[in-house]
Structures are given as structure tokens and as C-alpha cells.
């Protein structure tokens, strides 16, 4: 909460506030007394696994591989530890993840443009930078069109798909307009979400060039891709730095992203590139976290790649990397949340 004109305001965007209104109503009715962060995190995790399981139907038939890949985004990545902490920023990332995978499901597997738009609104309502992925969803909604199609065919396809695009946009545009009004009412600017109003935040050294800056890119690259683990003299002999480490070290399964194939390869890599650029420009690469928590919003697009570029049946390399990834993230969860081994 930040002070302003004799009041206190949340620095979370409107979508994030609305996401937890049901919990607030339960507190108001005295059904619960404290914010059930870990219960909400568990609900997000369960629903996300369900949608990942359903999304696998796009390009796979193996039940074993379907189960493994549905579990991987939660238990084989930094989502497990960060979401498991139940903090407000982590819950917002969890809602964004759920919104993205739900939007992909209702776009690609069971086309329901209005529901896809509702989930997309949930996603960018919790992480504003996800608005950058909107053109990718538009592309997925508008396809398919044959490679040899003429401009006439393209215009005909656009007219045919336009109603679906409009249904998709109803809730996101509504939320966007309400968010602009919400920001203006609090801080007299539709673009001011309030983060810069946190006392002394702009005095922190990593924000000297602003909340977002190209100067922040090298540090974010270091944290996201190259930061390693620490060590200690007793079992398990290594421990994790509390301010980030490489997503590929924390989840070796991600090395499989670079295999060839997949029907949605271009769309997925485009979304990953757009979102990663926005994340790398953030002055602070995540603060207290395991691995690179911002990259949680990349996982649904990584999932599309992994589903499409792998074998039809479960392979030994996939099982091996899955086991290693789950072990690393399970250990991280234990060290971060159940022990006092992790220190600044």
C-alpha cells in the first residue's frame, strides 16, 4: 500500500485486485480470518495442471507423456517454489499463468473466444506486460489460412473470423478501460500503476535509470540465463541464491525447447521474445526469489513448444530431465520454505 492524498492505495493493477475479491468477501463475512495465500496458490496450481493436461491434446496422444508434460510446468520449474510461498506478487504471477494457459486452451483446443478473452483478461490484469502477447492470440484466433492463399482469401478469412475476434476482445478492452479509470482516480494518470509511489523505491540503485530501462537488460540476462548455484559442506552440498539463478539450471527440461518441429513454433517463440524483452527491461530482476520468477509468464508458450517438438511417445530423455527438474525444484522449495538455509 502507498500513501496518497490522505489515503492508502494498492500498487497492484485492477485485475490483480479483482482476482482476490472473492477471498476478501470471505474475510468480510468472517468465514476466514487471514489471507489463505497457500490455499489460493494450490488452487491456481491445480487448475493450471488441468488446463495444461487438456492443452496437450493439440499434438499428442500418449497418456504417459501427457501426464508428465502437464505436471512439468508446476513441479518441474520455479513455479513450485515461488507460487508455494503464497506471497502477493507470486499469487499475481500464478493468476497470470492460469490466465494464459486458459486463454490458449479456449483458443486452440476448444475454441470459445469469449472465454479465451476472459482468461486473457485475467492474465494481463495481473501482469500488465502480457498485453504484448495479444497480437499472438489474435493470430491464433484468425488462422488457419493456406500458405498459397490470395489477398482475397485473406480478406475473406478476416471477415469470417472477425466476430470471434470481437468476442475475444470484449472483456480485455473492458478491463483495460476500467484499469485506466482506476489509475487516474488514484494517481491522476491512466498510465500510473503506483509502483513508483512506494516510499524510496526510486532511490534504490537498480532504478536509477527508471523502473524500466535498457540499462537493466545485462543484469536480467545474467540472472535469468547464467547465474549459478552456491554450495555448502554438507548434504545436499549445493544451495540456491535467494536473488535468482538460471532457468535452465533450475529446470534442465527446458533444454528440450530447442528441438525442431511443432505447429505453433513461430507463435510461441514470438510471444517468448516479446515478453522476455519486457522482463529484461525491468530495473529489478525479481528480488527475493528462486530462479527468475518473472519468467513464470513464459511457461505456457514454452509448453506449446515442448508438446509440439517432441516424440509421440514418452522418451527416456524426457523422463530423465523431468526427474532431475522436479528434484531440483523440490529441493529449492524445501530450502526456501521449510528451512532457514537461504539467506540474503
Regions found by a protein language model. Name each.
Residues 1-344:
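Membrane-proximal envelope and lipid/glycan-remodeling enzymes
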Amino acid at each position: 500500500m502507498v500513501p496518497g492524498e490522505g489515503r492508502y492505495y494498492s500498487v497492484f493493477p485492477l485485475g490483480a485486485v479483482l482476482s482476490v475479491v472473492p477471498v476478501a468477501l470471505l474475510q468480510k463475512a468472517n468465514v476466514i480470518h487471514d489471507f489463505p495465500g497457500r490455499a489460493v496458490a494450490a488452487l491456481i496450481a491445480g487448475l493450471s495442471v488441468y488446463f495444461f493436461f487438456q492443452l496437450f491434446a493439440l499434438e499428442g496422444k500418449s497418456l504417459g507423456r501427457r501426464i508428465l508434460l502437464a505436471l512439468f510446468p508446476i513441479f518441474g520449474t520455479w513455479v513450485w517454489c515461488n507460487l508455494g510461498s503464497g506471497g502477493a506478487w507470486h499469487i499475481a504471477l500464478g493468476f497470470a499463468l492460469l490466465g494464459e494457459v486458459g486463454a490458449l486452451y479456449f483458443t486452440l483446443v476448444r475454441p470459445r473466444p469469449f472465454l479465451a478473452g476472459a482468461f486473457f483478461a485475467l492474465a494481463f490484469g495481473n501482469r500488465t506486460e502480457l498485453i504484448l502477447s495479444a497480437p499472438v492470440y489474435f493470430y491464433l484466433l484468425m488462422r488457419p489460412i493456406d500458405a498459397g492463399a490470395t489477398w482475397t482469401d485473406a480478406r475473406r478469412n478476416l471477415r469470417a473470423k472477425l466476430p470471434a475476434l470481437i468476442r475475444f476482445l470484449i472483456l480485455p478492452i473492458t478491463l483495460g478501460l476500467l484499469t485506466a479509470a482506476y489509475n487516474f482516480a488514484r494517481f491522476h494518470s491512466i498510465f500510473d500503476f503506483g509502483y513508483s509511489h512506494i516510499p524510496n523505491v526510486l532511490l534504490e540503485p537498480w532504478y536509477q535509470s527508471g523502473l524500466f530501462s535498457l540499462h537493466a537488460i545485462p543484469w536480467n540476462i545474467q540472472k535469468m540465463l547464467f547465474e549459478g548455484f552456491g554450495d555448502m559442506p554438507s548434504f545436499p552440498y549445493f544451495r540456491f541464491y535467494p536473488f535468482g539463478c538460471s532457468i535452465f539450471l533450475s529446470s534442465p527440461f527446458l533444454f528440450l525447447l530447442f528441438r525442431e518441429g511443432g505447429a505453433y513454433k513461430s507463435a510461441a517463440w514470438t510471444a517468448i521474445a516479446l515478453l522476455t524483452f519486457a522482463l529484461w527491461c525491468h530495473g529489478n530482476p525479481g528480488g527475493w526469489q528462486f530462479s527468475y520468477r518473472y519468467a513464470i509468464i513464459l511457461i505456457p508458450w514454452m509448453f506449446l513448444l515442448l508438446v509440439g517438438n517432441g516424440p509421440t511417445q514418452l522418451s527416456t530423455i524426457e523422463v530423465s530431465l523431468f526427474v532431475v527438474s522436479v528434484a531440483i525444484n523440490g529441493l529449492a522449495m524445501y530450502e526456501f520454505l521449510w528451512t532457514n538455509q537461504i539467506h540474503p
